[in-house]
Amino acid sequence: MECKTVFLNGDFLKNSVNVNLNRLATVETLLRHVLGDSYETVLERAYLTHQSRIVHPDIQLCKLEGKSTSAHLNLTLCTRVLGGKGGFGSQLRAAGGRMSKKRNEQENQDSCRDLDGNRLGTIRQAKELSEYLAKKPAETRAKKEAKKQKLNKVLAADSSSSRFDDHEYLEDLEQSVSNVRDAFQNSLLYRRGSTSASSFSSGSNGATTDEPAEKEARNNNSSINSWSRRMQASESSNEAEGEDSESQTSKSLYEWDDPLYGL
């Protein structure tokens, strides 16, 4: 019967122990032979390793040989270490995932290339351009429709800059202006008459004093005439602006209705 020499060392042994056992014997038999009846208590506080691998007590010695041709085995009895509550590995994985996500957000990978040799930045720009070109016709149609509806709404509603057609008020205004003009002229004539009377009583200096009064009357008449001309010009300009706005609105609608306008 072939035997196997086993060297056993560890924390529970003062010195290394060598034992010759049958190759078919188990590790439990080895521990019972070395430690006696207390081997069960020792196994609760320690475990066996062979070539940095944990060995179960029920395994046979011949199965530990493997491809080794050595005539002996080295087993180590290691003390068990109390573990923590666990979960530390999952915390590390979660922290690593957050770090990698943050790193990917901060890094600019546009200069990197894919397996086909195309830059990632070029691919991203092409994708954005295709999406923009796909949405552009719909946006253009929506803008044109909104503009057309706005013009139709302006035409349908009452214009805020409508013409002032109160003829009675205009006649009263013209009459008031003419009355003011007549009163002003009468006052000038009265002043000129009083001035001429005083100059006649003064003697030969009357002819010279009449001339400034006549000049002042002429200047006042010219100022009244210029004021009335400005009033008429402003009224005519308001009428012209109203006609221009109506023609411009109709022209814009004609451009929308006729697609060949301006070609």
UniProtKB/Swiss-Prot annotation:
Disruption phenotype: Leads to abnormal splicing of introns featuring long spacing between the branchpoint and 3'-splice site. Disrupts association of cay1/cactin with spliceosomes. Sensitive to genotoxic stress by hydroxyurea, valproic acid, sodium butyrate, and cadmium. Sensitive to cold and thermal stress; simultaneous knockout of tls1 exacerbates the growth defect. Residues 1-84 form a propeptide. This is Splicing regulator sde2. PANTHER family: SPLICING FACTOR SF3A-RELATED, SPLICING REGULATOR SDE2. It holds the Pfam family SDE2. Residues 102-117 have a biased composition (Basic and acidic residues). Belongs to the SDE2 family. Plays a role in pre-mRNA splicing by facilitating excision of introns featuring relatively long (>21 nucleotides) spacing between the branchpoint and 3'-splice site (ss). Recruits cactin to the spliceosome which may enable folding of RNA between the branchpoint and 3'-ss, to guide the splice site towards the spliceosome's catalytic center. Required for proper chromatin organization by assisting splicing of components involved in genomic stability and telomere organization. It is found in: Cytoplasm; Nucleus.
